[in-house]
Amino acid sequence: MNVPDINRSILRMHIATIEAKYPIKIIGLLPRGSVGHVFEDNALDFLAEKRPGLDLLGLAGAEVSLSDLLGRPVGIVLKSGLKGREAEEFPRIVEPV
């Protein structure tokens, strides 16, 4: 199934809301399927940087909050958590928002 395009200005607005609420910086969009814990076809996968104070609960909260704002499932991968091939590949393939 093809994922419909999302309005980039609305996406940026919602990302700014999440970044103001949680200690996280969204770098951009990853190709669908990059986040292993989100399986829905219409999900959006993001690469993010961890800011001081972010814990697992905050990361989960950011995912849920952004998902609620966008009306579709969201997965967030932290750049600091990448290892091996993904640590090299994801920063190169991320699409800025």
Protein language model regions, located:
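Short glycine-rich His-centered loop
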Residues: L44-D45
